[in-house]
Amino acid sequence: MKNTRLFMFAACTLFLAACGRQTVKIMTPPDASNRVLFGAEQLQTTLDKAGYQVMMQQGDTTFSDPEIKTILLTEVNDTTLKKEGFHISTTGNLTRVSGRDGSGVIYGCRELIDRVNDSDGKLNFPEELKDGPEMVLRGACVGLQKMTYLPGHGVYEYPYTPESFPWFYDKEQWIKYLDMLVANRMNSLYLWNGHPFASLVKLEDYPFALEVDEETFKMNEEMFSFLTEEADKRGIFVIQMFYNIILSKPFAEHYGLKTQDRNRPITPLIADYTRKSIAAFIEKYPNVGLLVCLGEAMCTVEDDVEWFTKTIIPGVKDGLQALGRTDEPPLLLRAHDTDCKLVMDAALPLYKNLYTMHKYNGESLTTYEPRGPWSKIHTDLSSLGSIHISNVHILANLEPFRWGSPDFVQKAVTAMHNVHGANALHLYPQASYWDWPYTADKLPNNERKFQLDRDWIWYQTWGRYAWNCHRDRTDEMGYWDHQLGKFYGTSDENASNIRVAYEESGEIAPKLLRRFGITEGNRQTLLLGMFMSQLVNPYKYTIYPGFYESCGPEGEKLIEYVEKEWKKQPHVGEMPLDIVAQVIEHGDKAVAAIDKAAGSVSSNKDEFARLQNDMHCYREFAYAFNLKVKAAKLVLDYQWGKEIKNLEEAIPLMEQSLEHYRKLVELTDEHYLYANSMQTAQRRIPIGGDDGKNKTWKELLVHYEKELENFKANLALLKEKQNGNAVTETVEIAAWTPANVKLISNYPTVKVDEGISLFMDVPGKIEAVAPELKGMKALRFNGNEQREKGTSITFETDAPVKLLVAYFKDDQKKYAKAPKLEIDASANDYGQAEPVLTNAVRINGMPLANVHAYSFPAGKHTLMLPKGYLQVLGFTAAETKVRNAGLAGDEETMDWLFY
């Protein structure tokens, strides 16, 4: 058969040579690996498209015809080359591509392919070139997750089915994706899912745990085999990610358990199920790695250590033992929601081949100058000596506009090496992670745009600099000008304007979030804007700890800046007013550059028009934000100086900001389906995104217009009060009425009031309490039991109620941790994410407490609360108006002006 193919190739060669096509011969050894053959195939395809007649010769590698351009592909045991490295040498008509391994041959072929493509088909091969990657792992992820919850399921719970993920079963789409990874010299593919095992393996002891039907299960087996085989021949390592502790829904229902509960203890049943799931997966898919997230459904570091060392690692070892393997495949551990170094210290004696992963700038892209406590996590992990992976995660602040700044990416990857000590890259999609494979672009006839088509420059920039970030800036500008010129059908000189637009616009979202954001996480969608209340009193919205200290250069929040101005104190670092001035300059330059390029674009014109529109969107957003910040500065000036004119001068700035925001609405309304792809209750800033609401600029405009109306009305009242014309009313705050519930848990109760004790073994008594809480029927607890076991409450109610839980404002381990969406995606499942009363309870000898309300429908419920001291102040059906109860003192804030 092989001889027949060679004869046919030869015959075709003679025929086409007569037609004037230059012949190129590609030779591979008789024992060539699948990766070498794949490299040859890719090279053949490129040369064929460039107009060459390609002869493929496997077996005899003798250079016998000096008149024919010949390329010889071989693997060599050359220790001067890095793993995946290659050596290209050209003498006369013979070009040798020698790879340290099969992947090295592939990347050597890609080098030749790039040179052919970048030179209009010329065979300008290097006389001598050695190259290899700087980062050991260079990969991208795909989420088997969706924008909203599946009915009856919790966060991250998405079985692998054609109904939920039709694209997962599309082999052509996977081939395109894998080829994209190869083209960008990436060698790893991560699949993210909450609990994939119940879609991919069957367990003899728990046959009912399978979450998909038999037909789907067989499809999943076939797809996983296909995917891993296709990935392997491209030198790509497939890695399956999973969260802990999540159970399959049928397994949980069989035993009367929840699929996930952050605050429940580890039990033998849950551990056994998970260990056997992992063992079965390792045995069935031996070439697939595992990425372990010890969260978000586990609470304490002690549990994390126990779970990783006594369940996960033993499960991996069980699977290896069943295969008779003695090696240790890589096991990757995320630092998210755990003390990764502590876990690693406990795990390394048990399992050596451990990798670590931590988010680069949290869940956004904010800086190429990372620092602070989050950088220390990186350096602590990279100092362990294992491979440490920098995770460019979610990109919440870049959704949904196009982003692709080569300069920013090169500097960011350099920081990964030099600041964090990372030697591997994990890359999320640029936007719309939760809507993969589609973008947020609105197209005619309800068509959808694919991320791979739109965001090609995102993958190409990160892939290029993960391979080598030490490239000359001038050379790089020329490289990207040429790439953009090819894509848009214009000259390199004109394409430089497109690159400038990308690089100027690429600074806007990072700078604004790091100086004004509440969080870098999914909780905030920056490009929808922010409310004035969030700018003048950000602390009310719970700034994520470590964010400002880690995700940008040293600098000041607006509220800090104004305070220092009034106190005549020296400023430090990046200033908020400088940043908003810079972003409008970036916006102006981006628009000027992209508009200048528009006239000569001849290819991908529709995509260019959308890119051009995005640049205009960025500019309008920057102007709207700039004016709003200036208005917020005046409001904060009033807080210190009590000059009404400051508030009056804020109004025209807010009005001008709205004018730019209305232009943004016009630019986005027919171009985008949404801003944020996570469309659940986890989205809180600028406003709650429950049930897919408040996801467009048109929806937000109504809220921002109302904000201005409220401000004008409150300013008028303030003026009347100042002029002595207002009637002063004394507002008496009524106590909330306790609700009637059947408390099944056996806890004693007590009426809330000053002087009573809420703990049976802690001496402190209530010194002060918010009036809303007086008379509530609180539960009394043994504090030591709370610290050891957590708090579990079972009750039954005939009507909807709210359970009031008070968390102490202290990060000591003995106090239970308040809900935090950045590390616990279930932290708003009961509407409990934000406190309804802040500074509401003061107990002698303990910190102040904030009160959170957990909402429940009628029925029987069990709520597990975290380990540590907390108070359960009872049940109510009353409307719980959010306010600061003020027990910390009369701290005046200005956010009330906007309500």
PLM region spans:
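Glycan-recognition and processing domains
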Residues: 727-787, 890-899
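C-terminal motif of bacterial Sec signal peptides marking the signal peptidase cleavage site
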Residues: 17-18
